[in-house]
Curated annotation (Swiss-Prot):
Pathway: Amino-acid degradation; L-histidine degradation into L-glutamate; L-glutamate from N-formimidoyl-L-glutamate (hydrolase route): step 1/1. CDD domains: Formimidoylglutamase. One of its GO terms (biological process) is putrescine biosynthetic process from arginine, via agmatine. Binds 2 manganese ions per subunit. Mn(2+) 2 binds at residues 155, 157, 246, 248. InterPro entries: HutG, Ureohydrolase, Ureohydrolase_dom_sf, Ureohydrolase_Mn_BS. Mn(2+) 1 binds at residues 130, 155, 159, 246. Pfam families: Arginase (PF00491). Keywords: Histidine metabolism, Hydrolase, Manganese, Metal-binding. SUPFAM superfamilies: Arginase/deacetylase. It comes from Klebsiella pneumoniae subsp. pneumoniae (strain ATCC 700721 / MGH 78578). This is Formimidoylglutamase. Catalyzes the conversion of N-formimidoyl-L-glutamate to L-glutamate and formamide. It is an enzyme of class 3 (hydrolase).
Length: 318
């Protein structure tokens, strides 16, 4: 596959405690690495994919560096303990962007995701900017053409921008247009939105598209009455769920390593309360973690937070 590369073994290294007990294992010891892109030949039902791209962030006038996110997050995951669920993970490599050719990278990711999904592998994608979401989401739509797919975005931003070209600010507008083209419903929920970070034009577009929104303040002050009903609605109404997590939904004190750190944000402990029921309900088909930018990390703090989130998702995923 063009733009695809196998993950170097050097990224999956860690402390070996196996002399203590046979089950004293870490992720670097249980993950399987694909040497070529052939998901139908690989074990496990969680396909880990990287999308090494921040061209969308550059186009959106953000701080670049997220292209190095997948490699850094793999290193952070490698030394974490391997428990129930983690032995289902197979590293299916990374899609990279060639220069400024985001559209080609989107197509490659879309095809890779659809190929994994069609052979029974759910996809866990490490970005990359939030442009990741168009390629990932489109691949899920392609794999399940006759089904209702609910898109849940944990994010400070709506990412419904009007623009002349694709960027990290346009993925859900692109997915809306893709749903229009496929004559299917666009079912989008955004949780953690900062009103201060989205113009009225974006709120108007969200209203036009009937986007379900839970603001960051509502997450913090009305979790049981605003967040839980939205999660229950998505689980009840849709055949498949696609969860995309923009790490800038976290407070800057927990996640400094993003293009646009959040002054308020939703704490990691609260985010996990949202993620757990989505992982355990049996309908979650795809997850990505995006916008991690190692250039702005502080003592590996952001990498550890993002890796814990990915680790927990794989552990809970049913």
């Amino acid at each position: 596959m063009m733009l695809w590369q196998a993950t170097p073994a050097s990224l999956w290294q860690g402390r070996d405690d196996s002399a203590e007990a046979p089950n004293a294992l870490r992720l670097f010891q249980t993950i399987v690495r694909a040497e070529r892109f052939a998901p139908q030949e690989m074990p496990g039902d969680i396909a880990l994919l990287g999308f090494a791209c921040d061209e969308g962030v550059r186009r959106n006038k953000g701080r670049t560096g997220a292209a190095d996110g997948p490699a850094t997050l793999r290193r952070a995951l490698a030394n974490m303990a391997s428990h129930q669920g983690h032995d289902r993970c197979v590293d299916m490599g990374t899609i990279s962007v060639d220069g400024e050719q985001l559209e080609a990278a989107h197509q490659a990711l879309r095809e890779a995701v659809a190929d994994c999904q069609r052979v029974g592998k759910r996809t866990l994608v490490l970005g990359g900017g939030h442009e990741t979401a168009f390629g990932h989401g489109a691949g899920v739509l392609d794999a399940f053409p006759g089904e209702k797919v609910g898109i849940i975005n944990l994010d400070a931003h709506l990412d419904l921008r009007f623009a002349d070209c694709a960027s990290s600010g346009t993925p859900f507008r692109q997915l809306a247009l893709e749903c229009d083209a496929q004559q299917r419903g666009f079912h989008y929920t955004c949780i953690g939105v900062s009103r201060a970070a989205n113009t009225q034009a974006l709120w108007d577009e969200a209203a036009r598209r009937q986007v379900a929104i839970v603001e960051d303040l509502e997450v913090l002050t009305a979790f049981e009455t605003r967040v839980l009903p939205e999660l229950e609605r998505n689980i009840a109404q849709f055949d498949r769920l696609y969860l995309t997590i923009d790490l800038d939904v976290l407070p800057a004190r927990e996640m400094p390593a993003v293009s646009a750190p959040a002054a308020l944000g939703v704490p990691l402990a609260t985010l996990l309360r949202i993620v757990e029921p989505l992982c355990r309900n049996g309908k979650l088909q795809a997850v990505d973690l995006v916008e991690f930018n190692p250039l702005f990390d502080i003592d590996g703090q952001g990498a550890r937070a993002a890796a814990r989130l990915a680790w927990q998702i794989a552990h809970w995923w049913r």
